[in-house]
């Protein structure tokens, strides 16, 4: 397993609802947050990488939609996820 696969498996195991759960909104948001944080660091070095910036904006939008869905379906889980990931101040 590569480093990315190990990190991904660690994130999935931390946020999954049940064993083998990879599709719940909590897991998806956590994985997107990790990728967004990595790309944010990338842009500190490569400020003119507009192609990757477009991908970043798509990921942020997708995470926002998943968070809105989770907030409507399960507000307690939403609050716990926000707290755990440190997304809101």
Swiss-Prot record:
GO molecular function of the protein, one example?
rRNA binding
BP term (GO), one: translation
- Going by the entry's taxonomy, the superkingdom of the source organism is recorded as Bacteria
Keywords attached to this Swiss-Prot or TrEMBL record, sorted alphabetically, are: Ribonucleoprotein, Ribosomal protein, RNA-binding, rRNA-binding
| Cellular component aspect of the GO annotation | cytosolic small ribosomal subunit
Q: Which InterPro entries match?
A: Ribosomal_uS15, Ribosomal_uS15_bac-type, uS15_NS1_RNA-bd_sf
The keyword Ribosomal protein is assigned to this record:
yes
Q: Which family does it belong to?
A: Belongs to the universal ribosomal protein uS15 family.
Q: How would you summarize the oligomeric state and partners of this protein?
A: Part of the 30S ribosomal subunit. Forms a bridge to the 50S subunit in the 70S ribosome, contacting the 23S rRNA.
Q: Which HAMAP family match?
A: Ribosomal_uS15_B
List, alphabetically, the PANTHER family matched.
RIBOSOMAL PROTEIN S15, BACTERIAL AND ORGANELLAR, SMALL RIBOSOMAL SUBUNIT PROTEIN US15M
Role: One of the primary rRNA binding proteins, it binds directly to 16S rRNA where it helps nucleate assembly of the platform of the 30S subunit by binding and bridging several RNA helices of the 16S rRNA.
The protein's name: Small ribosomal subunit protein uS15
Its organism's taxonomic lineage begins at: Bacteria, Pseudomonadati, Pseudomonadota, Betaproteobacteria, Burkholderiales
Gene that encodes it: rpsO
